[in-house]
Amino acid sequence: MKNKIIITLIVIISILGYSCGDKDEDTTVKKPIVEGFYTNLHAPEGGDFVKLKFIADISTPEALITNSENNWDIAFRGTMIIVNGGVKTGSGNEPERALISSISSYIDILNMNFNDVTISPDLVNEENWDKAGQPKIPNISGQGWFEDDGTYITPLKDKTIVLRTTDNYYVKIGMYSYYKDALPETTDDPAYYSFKYSFNPNYGISTLDD
């Protein structure tokens, strides 16, 4: 009888302990997705690449810009977008890459509307780095993020850039305009990017929608 009581108590204690463990996991507080809109990121053709670094405590979109030579996530110049992973494409005057896979960033472009991208696919693959002569995001009309009709550069519909940063955070980016102040049907001031983004400030978590 005593043995049965002891066994019963052990089972009850085990169940209670397991339940408490579950509660601890369930009460983990996750930071909310950070959504932002960057207007007029000026990255003219022939200038330096403008580098962005996504960090857990983003204050304003403008705070994304970094001057670090090799601690950056994504960079823009003209219509070209590069990632801090792989090797230089050969376009000239590119920033240094991290060169170590664990602290590199990874990038891809999905054939999906920005709002429909709720989780990033697995990006940690060398296929999602830049290569010599070939940036991961093609800088070619109709193949990357834009269409060029010879007069006007337009972001392609249903294209979303996904990024895993050098610090293992996930971001999605939706291009809105390539012209200053995002004015419709203007070509007066090109290379002024406007885009929306969603950034998950929780380390290693690839969901991109609350």
Range-by-range predicted roles:
Residues 166-170:
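Glycine-centered tight beta-turn/hairpin loop motif at sheet-sheet or coil-to-beta transitions
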Residues 161-165:
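A short beta-strand micro-motif
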Residues 1-2:
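N-terminal secretory signal peptides that target proteins for export/translocation
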Residues 172-177:
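Short beta-strand-centered aromatic/proline hotspots
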Residues 15-19:
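C-terminal motif of bacterial Sec signal peptides marking the signal peptidase cleavage site
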Residues 5-14:
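Sec-dependent N-terminal signal peptides
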Residues 188-193:
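Short coil-to-beta strand junction motifs in C2/discoidin
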Residues 21-159, 181-184, 197-210:
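N-terminal "domain-start" segment
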